[in-house]
From Swiss-Prot:
Originating organism: Mus musculus
GO biological process: negative regulation of DNA-templated transcription; negative regulation of transcription by RNA polymerase II; protein heterooligomerization; protein homooligomerization
Name by which UniProt lists this protein: Zinc finger protein 746
Coiled-coil residues: 16-92
Biased composition (Gly residues): 491-509
Location relative to the cell: Cytoplasm; Nucleus
Keywords: Coiled coil, Cytoplasm, DNA-binding, Isopeptide bond, Metal-binding, Nucleus, Repeat, Repressor, Transcription, Transcription regulation, Ubl conjugation, Zinc, Zinc-finger
Amino acid sequence: MAEAAAAPISPWTMAATIQAMERKIESQAARLLSLEGRTGMAEKKLADCEKTAVEFSNQLEGKWAVLGTLLQEYGLLQRRLENVENLLRNRNFWILRLPPGSKGEVPKEWGKLEDWQKELYKHVMRGNYETLVSLDYAISKPEVLSQIEQGKEPCTWRRTGPKVPEVPVDPSPGSGAPVPAPDLLMQIKQEGELQLQEQQALGVEAWAAGQPDIGEEPWGLSQLDSGAGDISTDATSGVHSNFSTTIPPTSWQADLPPHHPSSACSDGTLKLNTAASTEADVKIVIKTEVQEEEVVATPVHPTDLEAHGTLFAPGQATRFFPSPVQEGAWESQGSSFPSQDPVLGLREPTRPERDIGELSPAIAQEEAPAGDWLFGGVRWGWNFRCKPPVGLNPRTVPEGLPFSSPDNGEAILDPSQAPRPFNDPCKYPGRTKGFGHKPGLKKHPAAPPGGRPFTCATCGKSFQLQVSLSAHQRSCGLSDGAATGAASTTTGGGGGGSGGGGGSSGGGSSARDSSALRCGECGRCFTRPAHLIRHRMLHTGERPFPCTECEKRFTERSKLIDHYRTHTGVRPFTCTVCGKSFIRKDHLRKHQRNHPAVAKAPAHGQPLPPLPAPPDPFKSPAAKGPMASTDLVTDWTCGLSVLGPSDGGGDL
């Protein structure tokens, strides 16, 4: 054992161990380097986050500062609003107009203005003589007027009404200043209207006409009307209509209106009696005007309108504006018209029937818009699905109107030839079945005397026509022979002989048709080859009509044509009432249901508007020009079906 322990270690083993230790140390060093890199990146991200947090805090401080400014401005605006409400409540403030100089210089009269007044004037002049009405610069004492004008102490302003405590101009939120209620503002407006009527009654406009122009004096003082709560603007002069007049200082004492009494002061200045306002002190508002000359708005009286021939004479207005009684008579008469004044050439129809023959309308109303006559049946009640009476032009005769004869002017009424209402279909005599047009009525045969003589032997259904029974037998898988035999046994001997003969000949043809027009997938039978071809596309998924503009494909040529119009912009179906165009005809019909069924008759003696020209299928309304040759080739190609060129029937 001791010999084994004392055996020396091989140098190769030592070298391998040392190499393994070195590799392990290198891996640990690489791992340490990666950890140091990740630590540096984390520190950098942390620094970026701290920087972003600082920026957010700065932005938040800025937002808080802006919010504080907004709150301060809101409080200031609220105080201004309370100030304006107090002024409107007191109804006793003045508007001072500062006329600017000719070249922007300060007039000599303004040498003794205060500093804030000069600063205000500079701001006004900087605005290129724009109109400024500032309710912010409200002064509590009116003596500034005389101080600015004459440069001396003004006289005391007196009132005849009782004194009340002064209302502060800029009340604080805790001052408890009264705020007018909405009903008080309405009362102010009503009082202003009453005073305006009193001014018109007393002839105030005559007094205002004798006033000199505002340009004669450097100062213009105008008192706002007592209805300050309802300030309106004259559209012609741009001046508030509540400004009653302009009073120069030299003519204040002599030319005041009757409802504003005046008396002389001790120093020759103006003293106004402000008995109409007893709530608070007088307020002053600084204002500059753009106009050098002000036109006083004079109310218009009905007498002036009559002098210029603007109003209707007694009885004239009723000829142009019918009374409600006449309007009610119009509604009660339905499509007929009421009696009118002979001046307009209108008369009342005596009976609801209409004239027949070559007639002219006897009622002349306004001209109907272009296009109302093509679909006139919807608007006049004509049934264009039925043939109109002989000699009657449906494009010229609206329903419910009388017509005069060209010979003697008498009405020719024939109830038997009256046009049928729009919703009344053509009916066969003695039958209840209705048809939309006269050709359909002619094609419908008379009812057989036996009712439904053709009965199916399989299911027992009865039919009036043998053609219907044959089609039904194909769906049941039988031939026409069985159907004919069943029909012969039902109709009798004579009918049986003819039915039997027809059955032998028709049985073979129906068998051939049944085998030729039967779907091999589901066994369904069809009466036309086109229907079978269209049905087979449902099983095969074939869409033989591709669009050259996009990737869509269609099973029918008509659907491809409708889709292709979305690319070309062609809308061939145009509404004759409003002019809107549509791609499909059913869209046009749906749109025409929204139009009212009332139209206007053409004027008497005027020709009818021409029919609208048919739309050009080779011209796009969006492009306003002819279509390209490639589009024409595409349209011709799209018109080819699997059976060849389409015959216009639209089956495929």
